[in-house]
Amino acid sequence: MKKVEIFTDGACKGNPGPGGWGVLLRMGKHEKELSGGEPETTNNRMELRAAIEGLNALIEPCEVELYTDSKYVVDGITKWVHGWKKRGWVNASKKPVRNDDLWHDLIEAELRHKVTWHWVKGHNGHAENERADRLASEAADLQS
């Protein structure tokens, strides 16, 4: 399996409001940047979308180190999702899971790969996270 690093971020101008997502893919010396946005969304949806788009950009199954500054994404995919599935997609408070459409997409995107999830502190000088943040912010600006 090829080894790939993915750095993701989401941004929103207002929450909800215009939003964007950014991804930096790295395999060895090769890098690719991806971004996109939506006119009316939330920060959490853009964080999820960034991870989904990053994983879906990989043509073949890969060993992935995915870095995000979103504890929501990391905790959701590594901890909470198991309980949500058991409870029929309701949270511990018996309320429907928010963004369940994107959680389903993320689970599907993750299946093909061996993914290790990493949380990094945002806006803390992590060069690749800063690049993903810039891509997400630029994409959000294009939506407003």
UniProtKB/Swiss-Prot annotation:
The keyword Nuclease applies. Its cofactor is Mg(2+). Its EC number is 3.1.26.4. Mg(2+) 1 binds at D9, E47, D69. PROSITE patterns: RNASE_H_1 (PS50879). One of its GO terms (cellular component) is cytoplasm. Gene3D superfamilies: Ribonuclease H-like superfamily/Ribonuclease H. Keywords: Cytoplasm, Endonuclease, Hydrolase, Magnesium, Metal-binding, Nuclease. One of its GO terms (molecular function) is magnesium ion binding. It is an enzyme of class 3 (hydrolase). Belongs to the RNase H family. This is Ribonuclease H. It comes from Erythrobacter litoralis (strain HTCC2594). The gene is rnhA.
